[in-house]
Amino acid sequence: VKKLGAVVTGFEIGPQAEKYSNEFGIDVINDYFKASHLDKKVDCIFSSGCLEHIIDLNDFMKQSFKALEKGGLFFASVPNALPDFEKGSVSHLCHEHINYFTIQNSTRFLRKCGFTNCGSSTNSVGNEIFLWGYKPLKKNRNISERNELAEFEQELDYLRSYDKALKSNLSKEISALQSLVNDSNKKIGFYGGGATISYLANIQEHSRFFDGDEAKWGNKWMPGLSEIEDP
């Protein structure tokens, strides 16, 4: 985007802020996103792999709405939760995302936040959702509730099905992990997480943890676990 002539400001709460600033030659603010950090309103806010981790998502969206010029674009990329809901994925839950998105609820969420001309689509393999909306040029007084009840009921059906499949799959996965530990003297390696399932299976002492993020190396997901390693 910078190469196309845009003035870019980034936000990063981790220690990578300075590294990214130097690497990409842009201003990176080492703090949570707040409209007050910006000198003026912006034309576009882009978020990738972020919304699913934010505890107070409503406040983040309020800050984003406030920071945008009228007609400005909010664009985000988030994991698509639906495939994992449908297959009862244990790892999906243990990854500990706070917010879970589908095509239906992502668009509905943006409308609730006051954005207009909202849309969403998946990437070619269906594991990521791209969602977008625009800050209205005029105050949007009437947000359509059309079809939202039906969409909400569908979301509840997804969650009920996920709960049923998850209970079955979790028991099988715990048994499989415990069998691997009992049948050998080797440890089990987890990449990008694994803390929750290792506790549930009671195999903490037989687990190693890896992550591609250098900032995490030497730290621990939770007390009592081994340090996170360079894969």
PLM features: residue spans?
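Conserved short-loop catalytic and cofactor-binding motifs
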Residues: S48, C94, S161, A165
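Conserved SAM-binding loop
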Residues: V1-G88, Y100-C118, G133, G194-Y199, ...
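Conserved catalytic loop of SAM-dependent methyltransferase domains
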Residues: H92, S120-K139
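Short glycine-enriched, charge-decorated loop/helix-capping segments at active-site entrances
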Residues: V90-E96
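Aromatic-acidic/polar surface patches that form glycan- and anion
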Residues: N99, T122, L170
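A glycine-rich phosphate-binding loop feature that marks nucleotide/adenosyl-phosphate handling sites
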Residues: N80, N123-N127, F190-T196
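Generic recognition of flexible, low-complexity loop/linker segments
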Residues: K34, C118-S120, A176-L180
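Hydrophobic, well-ordered beta-alpha structural blocks that scaffold small-molecule cofactor pockets
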Residues: W132-P231
